[in-house]
Amino acid sequence: MVFQQFNLFPHLTAGENVMLAVKVVKKMGDADAERLAQQMLDKVGLAEKFDAYPERLSGGQQQRVAIARALAMSPKVLLCDEITSALDPELVNEVLAVVKQLASEGMTLVMVTHEMRFAREVGSKLVFMHHGKVHEVGDPRQLFANPQTAELQHFVGSVSL
């Protein structure tokens, strides 16, 4: 799972942050964990940041390290909870580009997001919730083009797509 707050350990480098879970949970050896961390950082466009500490990374880079850390565990489904909400607007696209690439590679993603253009473009199924209640479920293009509930109609009318 990837959260809106990156939750990187500040005393560990990007590579060490990615390596930690596979070493502790999967009991992977140092050399294999380092190779895997390098591969995952490369996958999110941060191969050159292996030895960088979180304080030296932008918010978007920190979020991509968090994504690499999650991917290192070989999940069947990647859960993303508002992963762009804590980012400066100019950094959002770099994170969304990584998620879009993962989706195109067949990764199953469950995302909580307010990035409606992204949800419409990349999603295969959208669940619209309002005040903790599911109001509509379906194809994103259909839901945005023809919302059935008053809540979704109001929401679609209030956001720019």
PLM feature segments, named:
Residues 1-140:
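ABC family nucleotide-binding domain
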Residues 128-131, 137, 141-161:
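C-terminal boundary and immediately downstream tail of ABC-type ATPase nucleotide-binding domains
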